[in-house]
Design a protein with these regions (language model features):
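Mid-chain, structured segments of secreted extracytoplasmic proteins
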Residues: 65-115
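Positively charged n-region of N-terminal signal peptides that target proteins for export
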Residues: 1-4
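Bacterial N-terminal signal peptides
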Residues: 7-17
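Non-cytosolic coordination micro-motifs
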Residues: 23-69, 108-209
Length: 209
């Protein structure tokens, strides 16, 4: 009887510890100083360069405070593209070793409502061919559990690369935001052996009530 009671108490304790560890696994920041849901005014200018409007790359911004200069989309979000400052990031604009394109989305109230991380399609071939692996690193960062993933099938003419075909979409909800990770690795019918689709796209979106 005592063993049964002890086992039940231990199981409850272990479950609580695992739940707490899972909750702690969610990072407080999504990317450096950026957390989706924060006021854009709280984001420092130091460490970030080449701020431009995603829809109008020729329109350069002097600071985050100029986000209103970028045109709004149909959801009233202003998209600002940016890079890491080479003085604070010697490897350039990379996430987990992958060259990336970064975009922050700001609503009319000045709230960061979204963050997009996309592997750079212009990266060198030997780096770009590993681009699909970034998705796994992102999923690991936010905890391996709780992802809802769907594998999509090839369309007409699409072929595997090195024996691997990948078109995957994964979603997960964490406190205050929704995560979407899309990974692709395949060759289109019109691409030669040195050309192929290999990319990861990460979308972090503020949850709405």
């Amino acid at each position: 009887m005592k063993r049964s009671v002890f086992a039940a108490i231990f199981a409850t304790f272990l479950s609580a510890v695992m739940h707490a560890a899972s909750a702690q696994a969610v990072p407080s920041y999504d990317l450096r100083d950026i957390t989706v849901g924060m006021p854009i005014g709280d984001l420092p200018n130091e460490g970030y360069v080449n701020l431009t409007c995603a829809k109008d790359p020729d329109r350069k911004l002097s600071a985050w405070s100029a986000w209103r200069d970028c045109p709004a989309d149909e959801r009233s979000r202003h998209a600002v593209r940016f890079d890491f400052d080479p003085e604070t990031s010697q490897d350039g604009t990379k996430v987990a070793g992958h060259p990336v394109l970064l975009t922050v989305l700001v609503d009319d109230k000045g709230t960061v409502t979204g963050l997009t991380i996309e592997t750079d399609p212009k990266a060198r071939l030997y780096i770009r061919k590993k681009a699909f692996l970034l998705g796994n690193q992102v999923k690991s960062r936010y905890g391996a559990e709780g992802w809802d993933c769907k594998e999509l099938q090839p369309t007409a003419g699409e072929q595997p690369v090195g024996g691997v075909f990948l078109r995957e979409v994964c979603n997960k909800t964490v406190p205050g935001r929704t995560l979407t990770v899309e990974r692709e690795l395949f060759r289109k019918p019109d691409q030669d052996i040195k050309s192929f689709v290999d990319q990861t796209l990460v979308r972090i979106t503020k949850q709405t009530n």
